[in-house]
């Protein structure tokens, strides 16, 4: 049959539409290639190379460009400009640290921008040094230092996300802190990881804590007193544990650890987890060394925040869900170990800050009636830690 004019027009339209789709796909592919050439790899959980778009953003090529290669050059420029100002007071363009930070805040939560920013500086050590330099060269201006800690903490949080391979940063930063084991690096890293409105990547936190638990807080080398060392904890675990309080998955992975559920539904931790708890329960928690006026979290407050986050996996809505049951068992174990430790003779009532009591109240409310893993069967021990508003404790 001869083709009609309408048919030809329809086919031409379909071909043009396919060509448009192919062009858009090609442009997206170029975005991925452009990111890779900048040292940034964006991948899905399955490992498929991709690009980044914030939640709720339309997947148009204009938005793809703006959120990916469009922010790389901006990050590179602003990182270098902030480095100049951190040492000289102003950048080559005459801008102050505060002015540059205001511009950086526009993109600070974009993982692409964040990864490019840290890469431009040269990685973990120069990143820690950047905040130290800002602090050291802005004596008497704590607001500038705190603003820098907030901005750089957000950038680290964005760069720590899995879609930009942020898990490796946990090892990178903890290795620098461990190798230097000086109070300045510890306090600066704690400042970066105790920003209350940042959720850091799960693997980033777990890998960092895994390394930092090996660092004895009693052997941290003293250093110069700057604002950050007077305000933030000198305990290497303080920051990452506090950050786990906002990331329950990281808290459970670290405190519940690896293991398996036995025939009774209880958690059987693996050897690494047993050794971790042995270290956590035998180390000192009084090496914060902060100024008495400081309101920044202590290491023990971070520890109890992580325990509270992990305990949120207790009592799942659907006990038949195997993953939920596994998480419940691990959370019960972690909660039991935590309550057992904080109700022991290692702690006196006067050592519990208001924050610690609040965190432990959450743990107790979730789990004080089912702490078989820690052999706790009395509400006396529950109430020794913090007031429990859950009347289930009366039946412990």
Predicted segments, located by residue:
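Generic signature of intrinsically disordered, low-complexity segments enriched in small/polar residues
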Residues: 54-55, 116, 120, 130, ...
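Intrinsically disordered, low-complexity charged segments of secreted bacterial virulence
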Residues: 1-225, 233-237, 248
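Long, contiguous all-alpha helical interaction modules
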Residues: 275-277, 281, 285-396
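Sequence-level detector for tyrosine residue identity
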Residues: 51-52, 113, 127, 200, ...
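Active-site cradle of extracellular carbohydrate-active enzymes
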Residues: 196-224, 228-230, 237-301
């Amino acid at each position: 049959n001869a083709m009609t004019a309408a048919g030809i027009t329809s086919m031409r339209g379909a071909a043009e539409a396919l060509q448009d789709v192919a062009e858009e796909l090609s442009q997206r592919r170029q975005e991925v290639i452009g990111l890779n050439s900048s040292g940034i790899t964006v991948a899905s959980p399955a490992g498929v190379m991709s690009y980044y778009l914030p939640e709720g953003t339309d997947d148009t090529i204009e938005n793809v460009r703006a959120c990916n290669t469009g922010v790389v050059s901006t990050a590179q420029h602003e990182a270098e400009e902030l480095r100049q100002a951190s040492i000289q007071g102003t950048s080559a363009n005459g801008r102050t640290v505060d002015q540059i930070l205001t511009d950086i805040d526009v993109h600070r939560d974009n993982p692409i921008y964040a990864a490019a920013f840290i890469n431009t500086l040269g990685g973990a050590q120069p990143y820690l040094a950047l905040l130290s330099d800002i602090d050291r060269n802005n004596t008497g201006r704590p607001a500038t230092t705190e603003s820098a800690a907030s901005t750089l903490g957000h950038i680290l949080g964005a760069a720590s996300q899995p879609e930009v391979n942020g898990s490796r940063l946990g090892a990178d930063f903890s290795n620098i802190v461990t190798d230097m084991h000086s109070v300045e690096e510890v306090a600066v890293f704690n400042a970066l990881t105790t920003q209350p409105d940042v959720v850091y990547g799960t693997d980033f936190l777990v890998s960092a804590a895994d390394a930092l638990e090996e660092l004895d807080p009693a052997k941290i080398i003293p250093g110069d007193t700057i604002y950050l060392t007077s305000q933030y904890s000198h305990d290497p675990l303080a920051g990452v544990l506090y950050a786990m309080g906002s990331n329950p998955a990281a808290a459970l992975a670290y405190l519940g650890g690896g293991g398996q559920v036995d025939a009774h539904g209880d958690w059987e931790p693996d050897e690494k987890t047993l050794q971790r708890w042995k270290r956590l329960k035998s180390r000192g928690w009084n090496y914060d060394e902060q100024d008495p006026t400081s309101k920044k979290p202590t290491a023990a407050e971070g520890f109890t925040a992580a325990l509270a986050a992990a305990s949120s996996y207790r009592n799942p809505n659907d006990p038949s869900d195997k993953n939920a049951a596994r998480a419940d068992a691990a959370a019960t174990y972690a909660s039991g170990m935590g309550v057992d430790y904080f109700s022991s003779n290692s702690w006196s009532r006067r050592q519990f800050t208001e924050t610690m009591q609040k965190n432990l109240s959450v743990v107790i409310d979730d789990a004080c009636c089912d702490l078989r893993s820690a052999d706790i069967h009395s509400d006396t021990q529950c109430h020794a830690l913090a007031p429990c508003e859950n009347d289930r404790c009366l039946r412990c």
